[in-house]
Swiss-Prot record:
Keywords: Cytolysis, Virulence. Peptide which can recruit, activate and subsequently lyse human neutrophils, thus eliminating the main cellular defense against infection. The lineage of its organism: Bacteria, Bacillati, Bacillota, Bacilli, Bacillales. It comes from the Bacteria. This is Phenol-soluble modulin alpha 3 peptide. InterPro entries: PSM_alpha, PSM_alpha_peptides. One of its GO terms (biological process) is killing of cells of another organism. The gene is psmA3. Belongs to the phenol-soluble modulin alpha peptides family.
Length: 22
């Protein structure tokens, strides 16, 4: 499902930003 893949990528990028700040 393309929607789930986009959602997963969005959360992964968001998590990467959070981890990048610390």
């Amino acid at each position: 499902m393309e929607f789930v893949a986009k959602l997963f990528k969005f959360f992964k990028d968001l998590l990467g930003k959070f981890l990048g700040n610390y």
